[in-house]
Amino acid sequence: MIDHTHLRLFQFCDSQFPTGAFSHSFGLETYIQRNIIHDDHTFIAWLKMFLQEQLTYSDGLAMRLVYDALENDDTQKVLHIDKLMFVQNLPKETRVGAKQMGTRMVKLALELYNSPWIAWYHQQMQDKKAKLNPAICFTMLGHHLGVDIETIIDYYLYQNVSSLTQNAVRAIPLGQTAGQKIVTHMIPYIEETRKQIFELKEADFGMTAPGLELNQMAHENVNVRIFIS
């Protein structure tokens, strides 16, 4: 029998879910315009780097820490991680983009579920105590639905892989079949990344490859674009 609890969380993994993820490449478009990424092989290399760097040391580790804070009713810890997620995101477009996506996800989650934690998180934003981040909201939703943190992280990583692949299909461009092959190819790396996240210390938070951040910053000066970041 299908676990409907997992299906409810997986709904938020749809690349067409209206959080605005389809409008953000997180620096991918810069690599494409510089012809560093130009086919499925070069995109896979970039996607692995993004998964094993930015999504590991920022989003993934933050999710693990937030889940522990939720279990311990530690509101100050959640606010601290929310702040760190915002200030360590140096490129303006990705920082603002993450805030916008977090806001949309929180509002959608509140429309669909009566989660006290997500309602509290939204109130903190209204009180100007939180910025709102999609990784934190996704963790709160999974926690509300009773999903274990390992599965929550797997689903979140999958959502990012799927969304970025669909964006690559449009931007490089690639065929839809090639895109699905890439997602299939990346599934083992999702598991590897989740395992790595659970080996990290809190002091590892925010470690990101400089090349990723530099290309995300450079996207501000891209003349012709189809993505916001």
Curated annotation (Swiss-Prot):
InterPro entries given in the database record: UreF, UreF_sf
Instruction: Please indicate which superkingdom the organism of origin belongs to.
Output: Bacteria
Per its record, what are the GO molecular function terms? nickel cation binding
- Asked if the record carries the keyword Cytoplasm, the reply is yes
Location (main, coarse): cytoplasm
List keywords of the entry alphabetically.
Answer: Chaperone, Cytoplasm, Nickel insertion
Q: Could you confirm whether the keyword Secreted appears in this record?
A: no
The Gene Ontology CC terms held by the record are: cytoplasm
* Location relative to the cell: Cytoplasm
**Assembly mode:** UreD, UreF and UreG form a complex that acts as a GTP-hydrolysis-dependent molecular chaperone, activating the urease apoprotein by helping to assemble the nickel containing metallocenter of UreC. The UreE protein probably delivers the nickel.
Q: Which family does it belong to?
A: Belongs to the UreF family.
PANTHER family for this protein: UREASE ACCESSORY PROTEIN F
Cited function: Required for maturation of urease via the functional incorporation of the urease nickel metallocenter.
Output this protein's name.
Urease accessory protein UreF
Q: What is the lineage of its organism?
A: Bacteria, Bacillati, Bacillota, Bacilli, Bacillales
